[in-house]
Amino acid sequence: MDLPEIQADWLTPPDLATAARVQRDLAGRVVPHGPDGPVRTVAGVDVSQFGRDPSGRVFAAVVLLDAATREVLEVGTAMRVAPIPYVPGFLGFREVPALLAAFGALSRRPDLVLVDGHGTSHPRGLGIAAHLGVLLDIPAIGVAKSILVGAPAGELGGTRGSRVPLVWQGRTIATVLRSKDRVAPLYVSTGHRIDEEAAVDWTLRLGGRYRLPEPTRRAHEAANAFRRAWGTGAAEGSGV
């Protein structure tokens, strides 16, 4: 798919102060409603890295599925060197450059993207799902496995579909969602061009057998496989 032109400091800011300002600015561009059109294809995205890799290589995968059948239609992969070290709250600047390259390897644009990470449930309102969604101007959902900020507003039931709000500074920033009976919950938030109710609905609709929805589960597997293949010299994808 064709990628938009992106302002340089939206991806590689010179320092964390600039990065924080960029996050606040881009958070103001998040559209918290939608999607506006039919969703026929969905993409899951995730990244993988070698443990203690001083080079900072990020291996990204985007897996495109048919929304109705969950058939895998395409897989895009790319490796990039992260422009900044890992700093909590600034994950997008490490991972989004590689993910954009992986999106560029696809032949078509997804109708909806599920991201392994936070959307607007972030100190400055721009987790990786919101960062990616705004840059691509594509409906995006953050499906995180842990809390970055906030606390559940109530006790979560043990059955699939149980949910409570995740609240921070007096406002709801995500939904704590039980995606499978008696497993740890997910933290689902708007990324861009989708409302919270639709984000939860799609997360459940695309899940079932596992804790993770199928798109991000497949992307997790694809990113790990790409990293392992790179280590053996057998990887195919977009390099540096």
From Swiss-Prot:
Record-listed E.C. numbers: 3.1.21.7
A Pfam short name: Endonuclease_5
Question: What's one GO BP annotation on this UniProt entry?
Answer: DNA repair
Q: Which GO terms describe its cellular component?
A: cytoplasm
Chain positions recorded as Mg(2+) binding sites: D46, D116
Q: Where is this site: Interaction with target DNA?
A: Y86
- PANTHER family found in the cross-reference section: ENDONUCLEASE V
Entries under HAMAP family matching the protein: Endonuclease_5 (MF_00801)
Q: What is this protein called?
A: Endonuclease V
Chain's gene name: nfi
